[in-house]
Every structure is written in structure tokens, then in C-alpha cells.
């Protein structure tokens, strides 16, 4: 029973942490904390998967293009 309680608590914390990381269009155009990049899927991170404009970065992006995307700028809506 103790293992089940621990597992339940662990999963609850994991879900709360993952939910707290949402950004961009998926989260009301919210920007990431600590100047992290917002990926095309609405998650914060610092690697090229999150920060590259070619990968669909939404804010605090690095490399390529015009504006730097700082301040929670969201990407375009497409055609």
C-alpha cells in the first residue's frame, strides 16, 4: 500500500510539473521563465529542439529570421 501511495504522489508531482511548463499559443501566449525557449508544442527548454526557429520555436528563440521572439511572442497561424 505504501508503494501505491508513493507512486500516486510521484505521478501527481510529475503532472503538476509538466503542466507548469506550458507556454506559447497552447498556454495563452505565456513566455517561459528564466529566458527559456518555448517549443512548437508549448514546452520550455534550452536545446535546439526548443530554441530553433526551424523547429517552430515560439518565443525566446535563437538563430535565423528577423525578431528575436523575446517577451512571449507567438508564431503565426499558418495559411
From Swiss-Prot:
Disulfide topology: 23-38, 32-44, 37-51, 57-61
Entry protein name: Morintide mO1
Tissue-level expression: Leaves (at protein level).
A GO molecular function held by the record: chitin binding
Domain Chitin-binding type-1 per the UniProt entry, residue ranges: 21-63
Organism: Moringa oleifera
Record lineage: Eukaryota, Viridiplantae, Streptophyta, Embryophyta, Tracheophyta
Pfam families reported for this sequence: Chitin_bind_1
GO BP annotations listed: defense response to fungus; killing of cells of another organism
Amino acid at each position: 500500500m505504501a508503494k501505491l501511495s508513493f507512486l500516486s504522489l510521484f505521478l501527481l508531482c510529475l503532472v503538476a510539473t509538466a503542466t507548469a511548463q506550458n507556454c506559447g499559443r497552447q498556454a495563452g501566449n505565456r513566455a517561459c521563465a528564466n529566458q527559456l525557449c518555448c517549443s512548437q508544442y508549448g514546452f520550455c527548454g534550452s536545446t535546439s529542439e526548443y530554441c530553433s526557429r526551424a523547429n517552430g520555436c515560439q518565443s525566446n528563440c535563437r538563430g535565423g529570421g528577423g525578431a528575436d521572439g523575446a517577451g512571449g511572442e507567438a508564431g503565426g497561424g499558418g495559411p
